[in-house]
């Protein structure tokens, strides 16, 4: 049985995630420095800003991406109305390195929502 969340619930979850990342950006940057000696500018450019940008793009486009798409029916299926319905598969396992980029774990999470 597919796991279904409506689009507004998904957007809400993504907005909450974005707000947490924005609120705790300095803590994330500090952790990246302490663990990997990643400079602040590099952490902002490649980790937090990239992830926030990905979140904004997903929030902006999720309704369009999830919309039912009408497609031209095949002559083999005549008479029919064909369309593509994008539905979630269910639970997702995200495998990411524990010792490197924050965004390598976050971007698949964003896409999974």
Which residue ranges define each predicted feature?
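N-terminal Rossmann-like NAD(P)+-binding subdomain of aldehyde/semialdehyde dehydrogenases
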Residues: 1-83
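Conserved small-residue-rich beta-alpha loop and adjacent elements
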Residues: 74-113
């Amino acid at each position: 049985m597919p796991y279904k969340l409506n689009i507004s619930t998904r957007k809400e979850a993504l907005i909450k995630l974005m707000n947490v990342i924005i609120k705790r950006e300095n803590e994330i940057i500090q952790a990246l420095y302490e663990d990997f000696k990643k400079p602040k500018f590099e952490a902002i450019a490649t980790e937090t800003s990239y992830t926030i940008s990905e979140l904004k793009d997903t929030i902006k486009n999720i309704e369009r991406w999830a919309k039912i798409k009408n497609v031209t029916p095949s002559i083999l299926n005549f008479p029919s109305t064909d369309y593509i319905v994008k539905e979630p598969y269910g639970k997702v396992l995200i495998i990411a390195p524990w010792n490197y980029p924050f965004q390598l774990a976050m971007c698949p999470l964003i896409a999974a929502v």
